[in-house]
C-alpha cells in the first residue's frame, strides 16, 4: 500500500531535488498529506507548492517531479 502521509525522509529527498535547482528552501511548501495526482505549481506568493502524488510509488513520482519542477522554475 502507498502511504498517504509524506514522511520526513521523503521531504528530505524532495528538498535535495529542489536544491539542485538552487531554490531557497524557504520558498518550498510541501503539504504533509499526499494527494491523488499530486501537483507542483508556483503559488501567487512566489513559493512553489509540491504535493506528492498518492497514486504513484514515491520513487516513481520523485523521478517525474524533476521535470515538472524545472518547468515551474523556468515559467
Regions found by a protein language model. Give the residues of each.
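A metal-dependent hydrolase signature that marks the N-terminal structural subdomain at the beginning
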Residues: 1-27
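Short, structured coil/loop segments at alpha-helix boundaries
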Residues: 4-8, 57, 75
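Short leucine-rich amphipathic alpha-helices used at interfaces
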Residues: 5, 41-42, 47-49, 54
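Residue-level detector of functional hotspots within protein domains
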Residues: 7-13, 34-36, 54
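Catalytic zinc-binding patch centered on the HExxH motif and its immediate surroundings
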Residues: 29-47, 59
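General N-terminal targeting signals
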Residues: 44, 67-69
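Short pre-active-site segment immediately N-terminal to the catalytic Zn-binding motif
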Residues: 50-65
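Catalytic Zn2+-binding segment of zinc metalloproteases
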Residues: 69-75
